[in-house]
Amino acid sequence: MLLFLVCFVCNIWSVFGVQAASNVSDVVNTIVVASRTQRDISMLVPIGQTNNMGVSLNTVLFEKVGYNSSSLDYIRQLLDGGLQTWMLDLYYNNATSNWQLCPAPFPQNSSTNAYETRTVRWNNRDYHCQPSFTLDSVMQEFRSYFMSTNTNIAVNLIQIMFNLYDFDFSESKNKTIASKELKNYATFSNYGNSTLNSSLSSVSDMLYTPQDLTTYQKTQSGTGISAFYNTSAFDFPSSQTFLLNDYKRLITYVAENKVPKSALGSNDENTIFFNEDFADISYTSDESLLERCGSRTLSDFNQLSLNSNFRTVVDNENVPFTPSSFRKYVTCGYSPILNASRYSIPNKPATTDISDILTYYFPRSYWSWAPGQPHDRQHTANTSSFDKRDYKSSDNQMARKCVTLQESGFVLSNCYEEHKFACQKFNSPNEWKISVSSDTYFSDDYGDCPEGYSFNVPQSSIEVDSLRQEVANSGEKYPIWVDLNDITVANCFVTGGPYAQCPYQRTVSGRRLVELIAPSFVVASVIVVLIFIEKIFRVNPVQTNRKRYWRRAINEYNKQHGYEGVPS
């Protein structure tokens, strides 16, 4: 696990096909661009329809490095690496009346140093735990990350799924500790929090709560895509509203609840979403899950979009993700949660190395981009010299600034290639048609989209799945143009046609620059010429006569008073 992020990023070189990267930042930039693009095209979609790969902190991290403060560095590296969905087990200790991360209580005969990591045993398993390491410690790290990425270009949504358990001290359930020794487990009662609400206090200003959702649902209204989602049972705000208007970053909900009602504080349910219907959580043990993908109808797609939110699939030691199943779950509209200790990847059939695991799976976790996309281009095109005669060759990397949908996902393609266009129906985001004719990305009519449809890009995993279904049903062939490009600014992918502006960097082409400055230049030139002419040919009789008059008056005055030279 040492130097995890460096290994993680370095190993991704091969995945993205970087032949001669000058430094690690080049590779990181590719991942950042892929993540930011997927976020940007989903900005108008409700947050419940967003999908991002996640990990179980317990299995992937704590079981390997221990339940201690040294794991905070790894958590930050995972956040910086782009992971947005997290699963975390919490334990309610009846002896201390506090919540803790360690899956075992701390006996009284252990060291009294709360900052020391010690081995504790529970239910015939050993755990390496630090008493002072609590949920609040983890949330402080999340807050630090939120503050450092609280900009329009870097802001993102983080989800945390909690599994809630408690310790059963009864002798019949636990063969390690007898019930009479219960009092020995109150030693570290000062560590941890008695309520979940207080455990999340450090991120309370950025946490989206059930009360926030209730307030939003009372005031929301919309048209277009918003009007479609307004009919949802859980009417969530869009990512744009959530991140850029409400300035929220985090949403938490309970995946599994095994604690009695008495363990919950009065405000816990006002902080965390406990509703069982809030999130659609599935498990790889359900063999029928993937069978339902690939044959969905429009009604099925609309049902998922309106009545299914935060779709996640969690694996386990018995049925871990495989390279094939992982990608299928992603394209099927699920957020895969890594919850096994070992995985099979090419050339390593059973690895436990988290850097190897994430290096392989993370680039394959985008529902939008195909694995390895958007690939690094050694040259960037200047739009002022974007000439079809120069860039028509499909091998020209400088023209690969427009995006097509292919069977594997979004792929950068030559803007001057001729393909058909993806046309989306207004106010019905899961209805697609493929244009009649093929043309370049710069076409004015976008292949003659049918009436009521317009050239667009899928904005969610369900939308892109429905588009794939339309391609299959219509018998069309890939690739298909989608409304996404980075023509104006390299690596800033935008929708709205070939000349849409990047929201993070304004650009002006050479031709447009001439158009902007030409009028001012002409006016300034005329003014300079007029001033020059005035200086040369100026004749001012009034001023000349005034000078003559005063000169004559002074001379006459001097004669009358006899002034000759300077008086002594």
UniProtKB/Swiss-Prot annotation:
Q: Name one GO cellular component term.
A: membrane
Instruction: Tell me the first and last residues of the signal peptide.
Output: 1-20
State the protein's name.
Answer: Maintenance of telomere capping protein 6
Q: Which regions span the lipid bilayer?
A: 513-533
- In its UniProt entry, the species of origin is given as Meyerozyma guilliermondii (strain ATCC 6260 / CBS 566 / DSM 6381 / JCM 1539 / NBRC 10279 / NRRL Y-324)
Give the record's family classification: Belongs to the MTC6 family.
Fetch the InterPro entries from UniProt: Telomere_Capping_Maintenance
The task this protein performs is described as: May be involved in telomere capping.
